C-alpha cells in the first residue's frame, strides 16, 4: 500500500496471510472487482488509539479464517486492536474481552456471533502488533442471513452523520441518533426500499412505546438474550456503541418478519460500572444525554417483556457459568504459549500493552463474571416481581452448533472430518458440552 491509511478513504493493496511459513491466503495485487483488497481505519473513539483498528474490504470473497466452506466467504472483515483499554481490568487493559463476550453470546443462544482469531500484522514491511481478525456485521449465509430483497441490517448509530447520507431517522428515535445501513437492498440508494424499512421500524416502535402485544413485532428470543448478555457483562457504554438490528424478511412468515437483535459487539467497557446496578444498555441513560434511550427502558415497562426476560434468564442461568469457564479453559490451552510469544514482540512497539498473561486474564474475567451474575440474580429479585403475565413461547427448535476454540462455526463439517482437538457444541436451548475429537 503506497499511501497513508486514513479513516476517510480506502487505500488499495495486497494482503497475504501465512501460518508457520506457509501461505494460506493471497489476495494478489489490487484490481477493482477482481483481486486485491482495500484498507482503512475504522471505529469512532478507537480510531484515535495508537493501535488503530482497520476495515478490510476484499475485491473477491474469501474466508480469512480458513474454515473450508464457501458459505463463510465474505468481502468484509476487520482488524481490532489487541489492546482494549478498560480501567476495571488489571493494568488497565483487557485483550480477551471481545472473545469472551462473543463466546457469551454463543452460549446464550444468539444466532450468530462473529468468529475471530489473533494475528500478527505487518503493513508495508512494518510490524504493527497483535490484532484480532474478525468477521464484521454483514449479510451472509453464515452471518446474518437476511433476504436479498426484503431483509435489512441496521445500526442504531450516534455517528450517523458520517455515513454519506446512508441513514434514516424514526419517529421515536432520539435526534442525535440515526439508523445506518449494514445491509439495505439496493445499497440504500432506492428511496422506496428505505421508506419501506423506515415504516417497518416506525410500526415496531409504535408497538413498543404504545405497550402493545410484543410477539407480533419483535423476536423475544433475540431481544431477551441480547440484553441479558450485556447485563452479565455489566456494560458501561451506551451511546456510540454498536447496537445492530435486523429483519430476515419483511414479507415473510411470522417467524422471519419480526425485528431481531444482532450480535453482541463493542464490549470494551465491560465490568466498568458498579456491580450493584443495571448496565447502561439496560437503562440507556447517561448523564450528558439524560433523555437518551433505545427500546429497553420502554420494554421493561411492559409485563410481557419482563416475564420473557425472566424466563430466558431462568433457562440460561444453570449452565452459563460452567460454559464460560469451559471457554476460558479452552482459550488458555489454545493461546497461552503462542500469544505470550507474540506479546513480547508486541511490547517492542507498545511497551505498556500486553502486560497480562492469558491465565491472569481468564481468571480475572471469570471472577468478574461470577460476581456479576450473583448481582444480576439480586437485581432480578429486587426489580422484577412476578407479573402473572404470560411471556408467550420464546424457545427455538432444538438444533446444535459446533465451534472450535477460536469461535469458528464448524457445524457444516462432518465430525469425522474435523482435525483432532476440543470443540464446543451448543444447543438452541442454551446448553453446551465440550467434545474431544481424537
For the regions a protein language model found, what residue spans apply to each?
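Structural recognition of the beta-strand scaffold that forms the well-ordered cores
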Residues: 53-57, 75-81, 95, 103, ...
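Extracellular/periplasmic catalytic domains that process cell-envelope and extracellular macromolecules
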Residues: 6-9, 30-32, 46-50, 70-73, ...
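C-terminal outer-membrane/trafficking sorting elements
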Residues: 388-438
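A conserved helix-loop-beta module that forms one wall/lid of the active-site cleft
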Residues: 90-124, 408
